[in-house]
């Protein structure tokens, strides 16, 4: 029968390696086993003597302690084929002494934070706050003063709080920090460094003209010695208000531009007097006097005098606008803006309404002015000569003097009997009878800021309309008898027209012609009432005649509908606008809204 052996593994404390050994199988007594293990390890191997514990590792890799005889018998039963006992010391050898030494060393290595023995000693440096010399701990050096240092206690007490302080944790500051802040001149070492072209000194040469006057030799010597880069930077930062005045000095030649901008505020003000407008356009209109004398009538000189104290429509500064907007878009833009400004001024001013409603359409001229109106439309918009431009303003007062008073007496009773229902719907749209003759031509003048070129373009189309909006002529006595505007009727007219447009698109060709006749007869009431202001009531055939603005029937109907709503077709701008959108009134209103918001 082979002899049984017991394997033991001992892992002692300290750097010694693990020891594996075999023992002959001792008796079945656990006490004898412990004695033989201690004899082998501590006497034969001469290992440091200590209390040991015995255990074994089962199949689950768990440590099973062997403490008494019962545990030893279980070990023999479980590990009969492979008996292996693990031996380990209960505690490290001389553990109490080691812990005491480690604790004492830890206390020695981690002293208190406020212990001065842990701080760096800055030799030959004295605290200017408390007089501590040498300075111990963190050294706080003032950046703006020549030689001012504080210890960490004085700095924590917020001494010298008005200047920037630099914290120096180590004692190598005099060689590095002084080169940055104080510059050369601190001794032979600094002199040698400055002779080697110190990079901090090259960019720190101050301009002789910018140097302030030194009062004494001490200040001049201090400036020579302490002329570092950061000291110059600190002086520049502290003297920022002085630097801003010198920086703005060369900007004085630009003051005339600022003065010109302050003299011409019409673009920002909603309402401007004619005096401000003439001042703003005085300079740009001087080189254009030759052209104005040749093309514009001489009646414009007395026009400006009576309007000098009365408010006008908003003025557009074309000097700045012409630099942004191309010239080809200026014409239509000016027409749209002027019409909008006149219409809104008419709607806002309650004392200027009278019996005319919101806006006077362009067909309120007399019978004498109607023939040149048709001739100018047939011959083209841009073919009007300078003679016709000067003749229309001069002929308008005489026509108004002879026709307007008779129209006020005879037009109303004849129309009220025939088309009373239509007159009720279009009451806010009826034109206002003119009361003055001399001020009519004065109000026809455009805003004062327009150049003569734009005035010529407007005068070319002035033959189409002899009456513009009167913003200055008011009748305060007739104010209590003014009818209230009914904007609901305007919306109803627009809705009816949109419904007619929808029906025209869905119906056949025969139905379209029938609806065209219906729309033309409904819109003819407005033209009849406007044409009958300057003339006596005509025959029934004359009332049904409607001026044709476009060959396309749909665009022509749209023009009449928008004129009934208060828009003017002066210069045929409304015809061009509706032609671009194929007679779609909502699309035309959107285009005008977008152009107005952009401007």
Swiss-Prot record:
Residues 386-413 are annotated as: 3 X 8 AA repeats of S-A-N-Q-S-X-X-P. Residues 276-286 have a biased composition (Basic and acidic residues). Sequence repeats lie at residues 386-393, 399-406, 407-413. It comes from the Eukaryota. Zn(2+) 1 binds at residues 127, 130, 151, 154. It holds the Pfam family PB1. Zn(2+) 2 binds at residues 142, 145, 160, 163. Residues 550-595 form the UBA domain. Residues 192-225, 245-319, 357-453, 507-544 are annotated as: Disordered. Keywords: Cytoplasm, DNA-binding, Metal-binding, Nucleus, Repeat, Transcription, Zinc, Zinc-finger. Gene3D superfamilies: 3.30.60.90, DNA helicase RuvA subunit, C-terminal domain. Its main location: nucleus. A zinc finger (ZZ-type) spans 122-173. One of its GO terms (molecular function) is DNA binding. PROSITE patterns: PB1, UBA, ZF_ZZ_1, ZF_ZZ_2. Residues 199-211, 375-411, 511-536 have a biased composition (Low complexity). InterPro entries: Autophagy_Rcpt_SigReg, PB1-like, PB1_dom, SQSTM_UBA, UBA, UBA-like_sf, Znf_ZZ, Znf_ZZ_sf. It is found in: Nucleus; Cytoplasm. Residues 3-88 form the PB1 domain. Residues 291-319, 412-423 have a biased composition (Polar residues). GO terms for biological process: aggrephagy; endosome organization; mitophagy; sperm mitochondrion organization. The keyword Nucleotidyltransferase does not apply. PANTHER family: SEQUESTOSOME 1-RELATED, SEQUESTOSOME-1. Interacts with aPKC and Traf6. This is Protein ref(2)P. The lineage of its organism: Eukaryota, Metazoa, Ecdysozoa, Arthropoda, Hexapoda.
